[in-house]
């Protein structure tokens, strides 16, 4: 009788699946370069026959089956394959033991097994609940269950049996208060099918009931709702909880970090992005400091536009003294963030913005000039807010007026070209400031009539423009999970499955608004007026690897554009469906949505549509839309590590790099790249060493076929023009913005930065962050390595075509953009000596050295301990140093410094 069941290591009995045997043997064969499907099938048949002979009518365990595989491989004379299989078993056993150690468990369940060691380390470091001794007391299964349960609680209260969107019902809320006062009694008492509600879930249910009852939308008393819950009347929503649990544990999507950390826990704050106002009076300034403290205490990050503050030296009426100016108050907020230190090791994250017309703009541009690793505004990203009138002045060569915000009067006129030079130079030298294009942000802003003003601030990483006291919940979908293979092994992207998941994630994020525990009442109120959500993407680089598409190619950019178009279209589609049942966001009637407008640039270019946008716009006019904005692309540092995929919309940082652990060193290899090497019989430790020594890149290595070199590109293999085009193509279909780093080589010039800013603006980006390799001035402490010269990145033919078209359309750009010099890699090189000297005189350090290593190195440089302390969170990961004593260099991606080892990120989202 054939064997039908198998016992897993955790004692579970599961169906026997011979394909798992086939997969394991195939991996072992690929390890030693054996490519023979007939031989593979023959061995699999022998193994299955032997299992049936030995365990007729019984239930073998996994070890029994693996012993038979070893024996049959040797009987077939495949001794090298058998050795590889034995080593594979040994590695798997070591991995299991390492996972148990990380999770503080004796046995692993099937959820633990789905995540890599790296993913589990990240979960253990920040996300899983710990006791007072710092010991992990929560499993990944329990984490994702508490997140999934919270996400479905709104469905219970929007059930048609208890909810009426038209209102008109009155409920006595005194009973609700009794439940609130005795939450401990209800901890774990209720459930949705098999999923228990803890007291924090229950508290969020009660809070949402109160909100809906105050609007007259609850048809039944709270006691009746609780009775229904107790009697299983809401158990039909168990499948919904199960589906969100499946999508997260299958690494198909992940919410932003605060949602993973705080769902079903005391803080209950699920958002990462906030903007707080600051007015030109001391009371407002101190209120802003208070607001920042409360938000960052809960784990969020803040954006502040300081442009309303009077300039330095201006009159202070109450004292007849002189004002200290916006930059001084940035230092105040920076100090507050320093004290809060989110989570003990995460620095506070802020975005400080000053608009280009402000009299202190030059001081602002130079605010981080002396930052050589010291705590000079180290809790701030800073950006200059640019408007169309500045670009017009630059184009026309006219003087540009600076305006005192207190009086509205012109203080002086400046040369816009000189200011542009300063801005580009500081970004070149210090990686700050970035730029935000407010006219582009507001060009399609459908919310402006309802809010009565333009958007003038963003969250810390710039991908989420927000009004004052707004917040946004974000989640990212793993694109790599939708690459499937046909019967002949050819890859394709499953667009239908992708559309389904987008809609599930959009609904998840809308529900999150209702169960969010906001840090301030003003944020609660304003967030619910617009109900912004941010459905985003990650795993783009891995998806392109699997599809065999180069990131920096027309085909790659076409894929990015289509993936983002689907993202926004189906997020809107779900938002319309939710609006039909629950109503549109409160400000909907006052917005441009009513006129058929959408905040999406691609909507106005019918020639590039892949989907019926006209039908969608009509549905929005007819039914309304639940969410004021729906898509964004945030940084996903640690979130993408949990999902075991590439970060956000960035190309991969390195294909191979060396990692140091307690037992020695090993090479980390991108999983998709590793599979391809093994499939081609190229995999070897010697090749990994060569790639690691080549900056983690395969460019110029003769052992690697040319077609692989085209597809498997790293961030520094890609010309900055192609980085810009990636951001622009994605921006075309987003309602909000994208967090992306425009990587430049160390020998890039100030002229390159100026060109990048102008091109980003002309391409329709909403902001841009440029990072020149080695420009973090703390890297002067790095130890130079004996590494080979990096192969110089060249722009793709598509990028060249776009560059020429933009400049031909607007000839004035040639005053700032030298097309031939950019294409030849000589743009402004004749000035580079002057630039280096200027860096020295301004910053009191030599020009930053090129990044010499892999994504990080762990050799301890000769730096005093006090200096190391200052560099934590600036150049080195604070978690890896505090926990393991290792100096791990941070890498710059998605506009944010991130640790490649543990996932620590300066950005609260990722």
Enumerate the predicted regions with their spans.
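Extended catalytic cores of very large enzyme megasubunits
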Residues: 1-865, 871-884, 891, 904-909
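Active-site helix adjacent to the Tyr-X3-Lys
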Residues: 901
